Amino acid sequence: MLFRSQPFKMMKVIGDDNIDKVKNMKKTYQSQKLDCLLTLGGNGTHKTSQLLSEEVLNVIGLPKTIDNDIYGTDVTFGFHTAVDIATDAIDRLHTTANSHSRILLCEIMGNKAGWLTLNAGIAGGADIILIPEIPYDIDKVCKSVLKRSESGKNFSIIAVAEGCFDKEEAKLKKKERARLRAEAGVITATNRIAAQIQQKTQLEARVCVPGHMLRGGSPSAYDRILATQFGV
C-alpha cells in the first residue's frame, strides 16, 4: 500500500498487485512517447525523478516545496509565500499575547527542516525559535521565558517547528521517538512544551497551529517570479 503523504517512498517494492511501480511508470512514459518528464515537488517527487532517471529516462525536476530543503538548491518556490503567511500569523499573535499576558507557541510546518520556522520566527519577532536541526533544552526555554517575565515583558512568542525534539529524544532513533510519542498520544512536541512551560514557570501558555494555511492561497510576487524563471 502506498500512502498519499509519501506516495513514492516504496516505489520499487512490489505490492499486492504484483506491479513494480517504477517499471509501470517507465512503460507509461514510453507508451506516451515523451521526450522528457517535468516534475514539480519536494523530496518525494525528486526521489521518484531520480528513480526514473536511473531507468535512462529524460527527467527535469523543479524544486517546489514550502520546506526549502531540496539538496543542491538555494531556494524553492512556495517557501517565500509560506514564510509570509507564517510571519503574518506570528505578527497577529503578538497582540493577543500582550493583551492577555500569555506565552504563545506557534507551531509551524517543517518535520525535518526548520527553514520555514527560522525565517518566519526572525521576521515575526519571535522570542524563541525551536527547529529540528537543534534539539532543545526545556529548562533553557523556561529560563528564557522567566527572564523576559522578570524584566517586565508580560508575554513571549515561541515559534516551534512541528518536527522539533528535545535533547533526550535526540538520543533515540527516529522510530523510537515516534513510538514513544504515539504511546503518549502526541504527534508533535508543541503541546508538551506548552504544558512544561506552564508547570515550570506558572505562566499561562497556549498553542496556535496555522497548519495547512501555509500551503495554500495566492503565491507571493517573489515566488511568482522565481517559478517563471525556473520555467524559461
Describe the residue ranges of each PLM region:
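N-terminal glycine-rich phosphate/adenylate-binding segment common to multiple enzyme folds
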Residues: 5-59
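Short, ordered loop/turn segments at secondary-structure junctions
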Residues: 7-8, 42-45, 57, 62-69, ...
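Accessory alpha-helical/coil subdomains and C-terminal extensions
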Residues: 28, 36-41, 47-51, 58, ...
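Acidic/polar active-site rim loop that often engages polyanionic ligands
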Residues: 62-75, 98-99, 123-124
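Short beta-strand elements at the ligand-binding edges of bilobed clamshell
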Residues: 72-83, 218-224
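C-terminal non-catalytic interaction/assembly regions of soluble proteins
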Residues: 185-232
